[in-house]
Amino acid sequence: MRYTMILSVLILFAGCAATRSPTAGPAREALMNGYSTARVDFGIVVSDIDKAAQFYKNALGLVEVEGFDVPADMGRNSGLSDNQPFHVRVFKVADDENATQVKIMQFKGAPGKRVDNTFIHSSFGIRYLTFYVQDIAAAAERVRRAGGTVIANGPVELPKELAPGVFLAVVRDPDGNMVELVGPKKQ
């Protein structure tokens, strides 16, 4: 009898474990809201794709993964471009299927117009990307060594009540887009 009871409990737990969703917390919530993943990717149109690629690889330390081509008719039919074909170069923080992708592309035959990137309030739209780093001082130094600029007085410490011991540095990519680096200073 005791053996049967223990076996029944084990079978019940095994059944519960088998039906449990593999995702939990915010990721599970995102999937419950109709999304297929909790990941968000970004596309950035640049004026010089090679220069931008060097910045995202060398200054930010992203990993370039396989890119892809978008044919003219796909660009037109999807509303992404006015019948312009384009190549997309893809970068990630890590070569991991769940890592956010930063996708850069250039339109040599139809160059875009620059927006005012002086401050985040200077134009509407997506104003900056945020990367969370392990050491803000090392990340800022990597940007400087790669020829980039940390703007204003960064890195600056966030208010202690918001995030004690966490710093913020804002840098610009070659087209002036803001990239925010957030993390602690290692001693």
Question: Model-flagged regions — what are they?
Answer:
Residues T4-G15:
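Bacterial N-terminal signal peptides
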Residues F13-A18, M178:
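A broad helix-preferring feature
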Residues G34, V45-A99, R145, L162-P164, ...:
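Core segments of cupin and vicinal oxygen chelate
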Residues K92, M105, R172, V182-G183:
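Residue-level detector of conserved, well-ordered beta-strand and adjacent loop positions
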